[in-house]
Amino acid sequence: MKKNYLFALTLTMWLLSCAAAEDPNKAALKLNPKPNLMNIITDTATFGEGCFWCTEAFFQRLKGVKEVLSGYGGGFVENPTYEQVCDKNTGHIELARIVFDPNEISYDELLEVFWKTHDPTTMDQQGNDIGPQYRSAIYYHNAEQKQKAEKYKAALDKSGAWAKPIVTIIEPFKNFYPAENYHQNYYNNNQNQGYCRFVIAPKLEKFEKVFKDKLKKQ
C-alpha cells in the first residue's frame, strides 16, 4: 500500500513539473503572430524565473510587450535541444526574451513583474521544477539595465521582503537560442494540460489581480 502511495505521489509531482512536456509532434500548435515592429522603437529584456512556460504567460499579458519568446541561454552548447538542457550539462537556463515598447512599459515595470512572479531565494528551483535550468536570472543588455536590476535587488534585500537571501544572478547577456516550436505560446495552446491547469493558471490568476492596471485588453 505504501509503495502504491509513493508511486502515485511521484507521478503527480512529475505531471506538475515543467519537464513533463507535451508531445513535440502535437498538431495544430498556435504560435504567436509576429508583430510588425518596423515603426516601433523597441527594447529587449531577458529573464529566467523557472519554467519558461510560466514566464512567457505572465509577460505576454502586459501592455507594451510586443513579443515573448521562450528559449535557452547563458550556457556553452550551441543550439541546444530541450532534452539536452534537461540533462543539466549545457549550462543553459530556461529564459524568456521579451521585446517591449519602452514608451508603453518601462524596464523598471518589467523588473517589478519579474521579482513578484517567482521566488528569487531558491537556488536552481521553482516549486517542483528543480535543476540549474530553473535558476533565477537577469541578463542585462546594457549598462542602464544592469544598474536598474542591481538597484532593485539591493532594495529588496534591504527591505526584508524575503526571509532568505536573494540568489538571482545578474549578468551581461551572453546568448539566446529559441526553444522548439511546441514550447512557444505554451499556456495558450495547452490550457487543459495538467501543469497549465494546476501550476500556471493559479499563478496567472494572482498575477492578473496584482497587475490588473498593466494588462492588455482582452
Predicted features by range, described:
Residues 1-27:
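Bacterial Sec-dependent N-terminal signal peptides
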Residues 18-218:
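Flexible coil/turn and secondary-structure edge motifs
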